[in-house]
Design a protein with these regions (language model features):
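Helix-turn-helix repeat elements of alpha-solenoid scaffolds
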Residues: 93-102, 128, 132, 230-244
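Alpha-helical segment of the N-proximal tetratricopeptide repeat
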Residues: 85-109, 209-231
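Extended amphipathic alpha-helical coiled-coil/heptad-repeat regions
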Residues: 150-235
Length: 260
């Protein structure tokens, strides 16, 4: 996933809740190394699980720029590691040693914000979308966790609205993974509806476009209409089959397009 691979927190070698001074210290270290032609690495590069990072002065500056605004800090933090408890310290020691399964086992021992968040990231790294969604539904379904998440990342001074954090998380997943891969694992009804809309709309739009093209043959004779009908059937077959996977056959939206 691009948002993991190129996460600005990862490039700067920090946790999402690391102090700003630590971020700046790592940035300055990078600049010093790069100036003499040396590469620099950090434990949070986790090269055992993600592709190696090609750091440049420009990419380091870009990473800092991406973390300027609180909303961007939160967005990228939704897809990176956080460390707030002694249990996290133990788990990260295993993670850095290449023992991601042991790290996950430790985080599974206690439900808390950092454990859930880190389990989400580990699951996404391993393409374990079922586990990622399961943990995310618990985390994003708990307002206390969300408020704690925001205050841990950006402090308590701001007035950050946490109500849309879940949908922001889902939107990124849909863009990077695809709605169809996520839907089977989702149990939250509002999440299903949100992802369903993102998955269905492009299919409906493509069907409607094909219908509009077919309707342009109206009045051009029976052969033209017959050919248009055959073309419509071919061009919409895959989209309609995909719609069947998202919608029940008695759904108004589906039956309307299927009938057309």
């Amino acid at each position: 996933m691009n948002i993991l691979q190129n996460n600005p927190y990862r490039l700067l070698g920090v946790y999402s809740n690391s102090p700003t001074k630590e971020r700046l210290a790592n940035h300055n270290r990078m600049k010093a190394f790069l100036k003499v032609g040396k590469s620099v690495s950090f434990p949070l590069d986790v090269p055992q699980y993600l592709s190696s990072i090609n750091r440049t002065e420009a990419s380091a500056a870009d990473a800092e720029a991406k973390l300027t605004l609180p909303k961007d800090q939160i967005l990228h933090a939704q897809f990176w590691f956080i460390k707030t408890t002694p249990l996290d310290e133990v788990a990260f020691n295993h993670l850095f040693a290449g023992e991601i399964e042991k790290a996950e086992e430790i985080w599974q021992k206690r439900e808390c914000l950092s454990a859930l968040q880190n389990r989400i990231v580990c699951a996404l790294i391993r393409n374990g979308y079922d586990s990622a969604i399961m943990c995310a539904e618990v985390l994003y379904g708990n307002t206390q966790y969300l408020n704690q998440f925001v205050s841990t990342i950006i402090g308590t001074g701001g007035n950050f609205d946490v109500s849309n954090l879940a949908f922001s998380f889902l939107d990124i997943l849909c863009d990077e993974i695809g709605a169809s891969k996520l839907l089977p694992f989702i149990t939250n009804s509002s999440w299903k509806e949100h992802i369903g809309e993102k998955a269905v709309k492009p299919l409906v739009d493509s069907i409607q476009e094909a219908i509009n093209i077919a309707q342009k043959t109206k009045g051009k004779g029976s052969n033209a209409r017959l050919n248009a009908g055959e073309t419509l059937r071919r061009n919409t077959r895959n989209a309609i089959l995909q719609l069947k996977g998202f919608l029940s056959t008695n759904c108004l939206l589906y039956t309307s397009d299927a009938a057309d």
